């Protein structure tokens, strides 16, 4: 197995473990989120979900598109955005880090506009995935 495939497999495994063990707490945190980007360690990448994914998506290169996850254990699609671990260092220079743990980071951001978030969510979940 080459290095790229090995890295991808490791990232996928870490995301799978994260969602298997922490999905409810992640979604609960995102349900009430309005001004923080919650990032979770996934190997070479950090991943954000739902509102955190929206805020992260606004900050990063537009070629990095969010991924819509359809999980058997959750009735609705979940939006995930990722950022390479090296680019998180740039975020540290531009945004206030509220929490730093081994596998979790939280950055403060400007408060999100609910209408803009809903439009973004519909674009990625409904229009592009045709659910």
Summary of predicted features, one role per range:
Residues 2-131:
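Basic, polar low-complexity surface loops/patches
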